[in-house]
Structure formats: C-alpha cells, structure tokens
Amino acid sequence: EREERLYRLTVPTGAGKTLSSLRFGLYHARKYHKRHIIYVAPYQSIIDQNAEEIRRAIHNDEIVLEHHCNVIHDDEREKIRYEILTENWDSPIIVTTAVQFLNTLFASGIGNIRRMYSILNSVIIFDEVQALPVKITKLFNLSVNFLTAFGKSTVVLCSATQPLFDELDENRLLPPLSMAGNPKEYAEVFKRTKIIDATKGAGSGFAAEELQEFIWDKAETLKQVLVVVNTKKCAESLYKEIKKKCKGSDYILFHLSTNMCAEHRRDVLKRLEENLENEKKVICISTQLIEAGVNLSFKCVIRSLAGLDNIIQAAGRCNRHGEAGMGYVYVVGISSELENVERLAEIRKMQESMTEVLNQFRKNPAIFDHSLSSEESIRYYYQIYLRKRMPEMEYLVSVNGVDVTLLDLLSTSKTMWESMSESTKKDSKNLLLKQAFKTAGDVFEVIPEDGKVDVVVRYDEKAEKQIAILEDEYATLAEHKKALRRLQPYTVGISEQFRQKLGNAITSVCGGTVYVLSQNYYSRETGVSEEPLGMEFINF
C-alpha cells in the first residue's frame, strides 16, 4: 500500500520470489501508474525458467518481451518486429538480463540511450541481486538511488542472501524497505536443509581419492547426490573417476559445465529431472551453473568451499520441496591438485571470507543462531567479503595508460584531468562538463570477454544441418545469418590458448569468421575435449 520506491525481498531459495515480486509489481504498477514492469536476472538459466513462469502467470504472451542474446526468430518479419521492440523496450513487461539492463544505464550505443527512457517510472525487479559483479557495486547503488529518488521508478531487490549494499562507507544504497518483514519470522517455515562444515578445519582439503570416497559414502546412504565444484577441470576429472566407481552399479552419473553447449546442457537437465523424479540412484558432478534457474531436488548436496551465497544457492537444489524432512549440504575443501583456483581471484576471496565464517562458527555457533544459513551468518560473511573487495567496487579501468575508475569518469573525472598536460588543461578550462561520458560508455562491459572464442560444436543432427549451410559456398547471406542464429545453442566459449591447443580440430567457415569443432573432440558426456575421443564418436 505504500509508495516507497526501494524495496528488499529476502526469502529463502525456492520460496517463490519470482511470483511474489511479480504480484507486487502488477499491483504497484496499477496503483501508481507505472509504465513497465522490468524483470532483471543475472543468469540466462534464470531467465529461461522464469520467463516461462511469468507468461503462465500473466496468461498473455503478447505483453511479455524477452530481451537477451538467446532469443531466435526464423521469420524475418518477426525478427524485425522483435528488434524494434528491444530497441525501445516498448512492452508492458520486459524480461531481460543484468547485462542488457546495465548496458542501458552505462554502455555506449543508440539502443541503450533509447531504452533509458523506458526504465523511468517503471517497476524494476532485480532477481538474485547478490550475483551482480563486484566491480559495478557503487555504480549500481548510485543508479538505483537515481532511479528511485528522481526517476519515479520502484526497485525491488530479491535475494536469499542480501548483500549489504546500504552499509558501505560511501556511495551506498539508500535504505530499502523490507517487503516480507523480518526474515527470522519465516526462516523456520522454509528451512529444508542443514549446512554442515566438512572442510577439515585448517587442512589442505580432500585429495582426489578421499573426495571420491566421501561422495560415494553419501551416495550409498542417500541415493541422490549433487556435487558442485569451482572449476571445469575439477568437474571433468572428478566425473571420470566417479564413473569408474559407478561401473557395474545401478547409479546414473551426470556431468554439467560450460564446456558443454547450451542444447547439450538442456538435454542433460531434462534427463536428470526425469531420473530424480523416478527415484533413480543419481550422482551429478557440476560447476556452479546448476546453482541458479534449475528446479531440481537432490537428497544431498556436496559443495566445494566457496562464498556463503554460492553455498546457500547450492543448498537450494537439496530437498527443494521438503520431501526428505531435512536435507544435508556438506561444505568440503578440495586440494589444489584437484581444484586449482590460484588464478581465480574472486573465488579465492570468497573462500577466504567463508573460512573466517567457519572458524568463528566452530568457536561460537550461538552468535550465528546455530546455523550457517542464518541471517547472522549471511551478514557476517558479507561484512568480511565486501571489506576485502572494497577497492574493486568503483570499476577499475585503464584509459590511455592511466588507471582510473568508471565512477570517477562519470563524476568529476579528477584522475584524467590531473594526468593532462598544462596546455590541454588550458584549452579545456571553459568546458561546462568535465565528465568523460563517451569514454566511460566505450569501456563499460558487465562481463569482460577475457579473450574467449566462440566455437560451434557438432552436437546433433540439427547442428550438423546448420553447419552444412555455413560450409556451402553457394548459400546466400540471408541463409548464413539464419543458420548462425540457429547455431547459438550449439556454441561453446573457449580461451584463445585452448583454441590454439586444439589446432586442426577446429576449422573455420564463412571466410574465417566462424569456428567449428571436429566431431571427435566433443564428448556426449563432458563436452569439448582436449584429446580426440578415439572410438567414442558421436553417433546419430
């Protein structure tokens, strides 16, 4: 009933954030005459799941616009209509990614400027707000403050693990109003899991054989186990070792990582869901991609040490519907020989912060309400973690060899002005604005490319058919474009170093602009492979 414009919805994973926030958005938009409801999620998997859920709730596909890179239209007229709609976000309900939304605020490009108008006087729902990149924290805070204080927009921040953006030393978020009251009041109602510290204290973590035994022991007891690790290499290695143990047993083993194309992952998730529902014995080894936008429920989850937000997200895949009374989530340390995160600074800082939480929890569990998923635990974790990441929160970039922050470029541009020569300063002294808007827009990117190369894989007959069109020198440009759109779900991003390592296993088509992976370098189990699969070719 209130017109406050900044809200926080804190409810446990699986407690219905999407429909609750949508219901609020519809009511609020009608009561206060808001122009749009914009639903923003950080991951494509969440968009895929929740866009369909929103459509079912609304009963009208025509008023829901999805804007992300995976939307494919084969009909040229439909494609043109879609491009016009996404240029302006001219639909009552927009479902989009954090990348598209943040680009609208900060990136260069005519389309982004046009969409800026549409986010004013709207209801904006940010799902899984804790997953936003740390580097944009202060820019995000200031933009939300602007939208709510001056843009007549209402913003809802949804998360099971709300980050303390309103408690930073500077450039903090304005204090949000809690939509669901005190989380403690309903925490017990939704409590379906218990997080258990199995990190072995100050030890170096499980070696490969120890971890396999730990997983097997839980599988023998609980029958359906999900294991989530931090690296693709660890997931593949662990999968291959567990596969040996499963030989001759009635366990069904699955692997999930971004080494697999999106269509492959969809197929695996579908088979996983069927086997879990049919009470089959299941072990799934996955990277963190399974932690969001995946409606699966295992009897037990084993999570490699990570941030508490990741651990609680993983716990959301355990006993999801309360069918097992209480589900158990084990946090384990893994040796650096099996899971090397030395070059993954973000994960290391998460692990360091979580280790401090676990150490304090062992000493005095009462201050955490005897639960690692309590509000006290989440708060303590973020106090440590955000303090470690504070220097990164203003979006550090290098412009013409000068280290500067995007926050500075968009405010006083002090660093750039100080680096100018005296003659340049003299020529520019009469400028009305000192902000470097164009430079900031040009360098802004939510997720850096990091030298990733897209490679098309020959996963199934549909992919083969489209690749054949790309290889056909007599195919028209329109046919090539349509084939490329249809091949989006069959694309895997790999590093340039990995591409070079694969050598002749990758060929190029369309004048060298599209890379295609050889069939025998793509496994039906684990995706892109460093080595040829021998006789394990894909058979159609």
Predicted regions, residues:
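SF2 helicase motor core recognition
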Residues: T104, V282-F298, Q313-H321
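Inter-Walker segment of RecA-like/P-loop motor cores
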Residues: N60-F106
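Interdomain hinge/linker at the junction between the two RecA-like core domains of SF2 helicases
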Residues: A160-K218
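SF2 helicase catalytic motif II
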Residues: V99-F101, N112-L147
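C-terminal helicase lobe and adjacent C-terminal extensions/tails of nucleic-acid helicase motors
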Residues: T148, E209-W216, E220-Q224, V228, ...
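Conserved Walker A/P-loop ATP-binding site and its immediately adjacent core
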Residues: K34-A57, V71, L164
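Conserved helicase motor
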Residues: L65-R77, N230-K233, L253-L269, I285-E291
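Walker A/P-loop
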Residues: E3-G25
